[in-house]
A protein has these predicted regions:
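N-terminal glutamine amidotransferase
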Residues: 1-174
Length: 174
């Protein structure tokens, strides 16, 4: 009938079909990433930040969410403790107001969960979770709850100039 033996019924060659299949797989992967990773991240950041969060504070909460997500993935190997140390600078809290806000939390010599220290113009927050018995995700759930309920962090992140760096850890106990 004069057709190329490598052509399919739709006039596509085997190579064309392979390229189309590869493109469909790439599209499927992109759709999964959007639905299960990016939109989940948006929901988690919204949950951490709360409904009254300023647009400028969202980047700080995104930093925390990315760390929590990474800790969640690491904990699959085993879990008994996790923590984050969040450094924040560029806040607009005056010295007197900051002293009042720190009255109950500052200067903890053991730097326990919920502790805050002031270093120059920077704030240093620590959140820790540890349990000998529990389920995967318990530690980051506790960390998320602590961060979500931290009024001082929320206030400091409201400044458009606020910036965040974070160091996180999990202990693999397998």
């Amino acid at each position: 009938d004069g057709r190329d033996p490598d052509e399919g019924a739709g006039g596509l060659t085997a190579d064309d079909l392979e390229r189309a299949n590869a493109d469909l797989i790439t599209l499927k992967d992109a759709m999964w990433t959007i639905a299960h990773d990016r939109l989940r991240t948006v929901r988690e950041v919204e949950s951490l930040a709360g409904p009254e969060a300023s647009p400028s504070s969202l980047s700080g909460y995104l930093v925390a969410q990315q760390a929590f997500s990474a800790i969640d993935r690491l904990e699959v190997r085993g879990r008994d403790s996790a923590g984050v140390h969040l450094y924040l600078w560029g806040h607009d809290i005056g010295a007197d107001a900051l002293a009042t806000l720190l009255a109950e939390r500052g200067h903890d010599p053991l730097f326990q969960s919920g502790s805050v220290e002031v270093f120059g113009d920077s704030l240093s927050f620590v959140y820790k979770a540890a349990a000998e018995i529990g389920e995967l995700g318990d530690n980051t759930a506790a960390l998320r709850a602590a961060l979500r309920s931290d009024a001082l962090l929320r206030r400091a992140l409201q400044a458009p100039t606020a910036r965040v760096a974070l160091l996180g850890h999990t202990r693999w106990a397998s």
